[in-house]
């Protein structure tokens, strides 16, 4: 109930105010003070030279003549996807390590940018433009005319929100973290609006579209607009379950419980029948929830990665509930993955190898036949066929699947009693998992750190104010925003975040 939630929240606040700094007594080759000076130097540059009203793109020319999100952007824009909320989390990690208020202020500025850009429906798009929607529509117009092989999700202006690439999820979770840290209601309100959005956009079956509010106008040839399909790709279904769980567990939002349970049973409903007992990246809203297409290089078909992800989810749901219905058809999914795996001769033909315990599978297999589908393009269009020669390079036609680890986890669960399985359940367990969930929420992905890596970063930051990166190939086409030459290196928020993560990991190991 809410009383328990309030108790939990009080304990979380206590945890949040307890800053763990292990560097003081640890034996290290590099003084902690040197690392902290470098962290602050790199952060000040990002906040004072790079930030736009608290928000960030991905890459910038060293002279700031050009800037990019996933694609080239206007200076008035900031990126949500892998951008502003991710930077905010790095600032909070640094704040909770060092106690330096500068990092908290940087995180608050990022949060303010996200609050400014929250859609009226409660979610977020891929990017924001502080110059307004007219300016953003002009950007889309240039992208449509200027990019040949652009990221197709940016080829049409919808004016709505997206779950793709965790844009809405990352924003909502970062603002939830801000609220738990500060208890400032200015951060709770947008989290509640985000929860409203997640609940409103959920289909009765329990899944979510890629975008919401729903639009259907972007039809290409004989392919309907895919953004209304139930989406598993890029973690949409998993992320929304995680967000509902966080709201229920950390905020005591009981209205999240029934939608969460529906989302769990939706995974069962979407699984194909034998011999194709897998999942697709998108499922249509027809009677069979059949696989649906997405971008031109994402055909309708069953997908190995989606299947592995849903198997892990089902095992997680079993831990939460102790209900064996979540385990019942996992062996069918394993059988499906085994049936589409490449043998050694085929992997040699493809020039691929895998690690021990992994299998190599096609990214997509054809509905009804299990034949691998391969992805191609030329300057004018994409196509899909059965020929593994001449494949596109920006999106792989094959995927490595950790099948053995899935099987091991499944067998381990079978060996446990129901009481053992559910001991950490957020619903029926005897253990308060809020601290574990909060830790996951707080830390994010941490980089492995060693003395050599840290020393290399420190050397760079003695010469520069930033950690340089390279412009990714998808960003190199010029849709006409600038005639300035492409830089040999860029100011990269990815390199900044990786570097900060390395420093933090080193100081806390």
Kindly label every feature range from the protein language model:
Residues 1-10:
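N-terminal export leaders
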Residues 12, 39-42, 83:
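Short N-terminal amphipathic alpha-helix/helix-capping patch enriched in small hydrophobics
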Residues 4, 25-45, 109, 149-156, ...:
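Terminal, non-catalytic domain-edge segments
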């Amino acid at each position: 109930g809410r009383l328990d939630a309030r108790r939990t929240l009080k304990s979380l606040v206590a945890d949040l105010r307890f800053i763990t700094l292990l560097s003081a007594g640890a034996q290290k080759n590099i003084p902690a003070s040197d690392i902290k000076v470098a962290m602050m130097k790199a952060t000040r540059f990002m906040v004072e030279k790079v930030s736009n009203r608290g928000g960030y793109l991905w890459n910038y020319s060293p002279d700031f003549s050009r800037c990019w999100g996933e694609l080239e952007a206007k200076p008035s824009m900031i990126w949500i996807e892998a951008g502003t909320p991710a930077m905010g989390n790095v600032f909070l990690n640094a704040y909770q390590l060092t106690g330096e208020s500068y990092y908290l202020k940087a995180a608050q500025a990022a949060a303010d940018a996200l609050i400014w850009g929250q859609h009226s429906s409660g979610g977020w798009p891929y990017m924001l433009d502080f110059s307004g929607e007219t300016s953003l529509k002009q950007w889309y117009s240039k992208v449509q005319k200027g990019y040949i092989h652009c990221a197709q999700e940016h080829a049409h202006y919808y004016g709505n929100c997206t779950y793709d690439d965790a844009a809405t999820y990352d924003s909502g979770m970062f603002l939830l973290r801000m609220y738990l840290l500060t208890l400032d209601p200015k951060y709770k309100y947008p989290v509640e609006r985000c929860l409203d959005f997640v609940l409103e956009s959920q289909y009765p079956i329990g899944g979510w579209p890629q975008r919401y509010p729903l639009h259907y106008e972007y039809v290409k040839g004989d392919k309907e607009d895919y953004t209304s399909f139930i989406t598993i790709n890029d973690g949409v279904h998993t992320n929304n379950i995680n967000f509902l769980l966080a709201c229920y567990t950390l905020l005591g939002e009981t209205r999240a419980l029934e939608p969460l349970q529906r989302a769990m049973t939706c995974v069962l409903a979407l699984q194909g029948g034998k011999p194709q007992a897998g999942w697709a990246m998108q499922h249509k809203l027809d009677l069979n929830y059949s696989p649906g297409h997405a971008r031109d290089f994402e055909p309708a078909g069953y997908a190995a990665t989606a299947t592995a992800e849903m198997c892990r989810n089902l095992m997680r749901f079993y831990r939460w509930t102790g209900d064996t219905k979540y385990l019942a058809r996992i062996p069918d999914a394993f059988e499906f993955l085994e049936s589409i795996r490449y043998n050694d001769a085929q992997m040699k033909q493809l020039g691929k190898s895998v690690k021990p315990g992994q299998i190599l599978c096609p990214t997509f297999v054809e509905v009804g036949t299990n034949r691998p589908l391969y992805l191609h393009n030329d300057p004018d269009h994409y196509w899909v066929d059965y020929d593994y020669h001449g494949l596109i390079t920006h999106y792989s036609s094959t995927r490595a699947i950790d099948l053995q680890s899935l099987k091991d986890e499944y067998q381990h669960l079978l060996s446990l009693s129901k009481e053992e399985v559910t001991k950490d359940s957020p619903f029926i367990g005897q253990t308060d998992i809020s601290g574990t969930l909060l830790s996951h929420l707080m830390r994010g992905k941490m980089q492995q750190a060693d003395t050599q890596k840290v020393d290399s970063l420190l050397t760079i930051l003695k010469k520069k104010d930033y950690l340089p990166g390279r412009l990714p190939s998808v960003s190199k086409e010029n849709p006409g925003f600038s005639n300035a030459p492409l830089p040999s290196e860029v100011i990269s928020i990815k390199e900044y975040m990786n570097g900060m993560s390395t420093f933090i990991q080193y100081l806390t190991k």
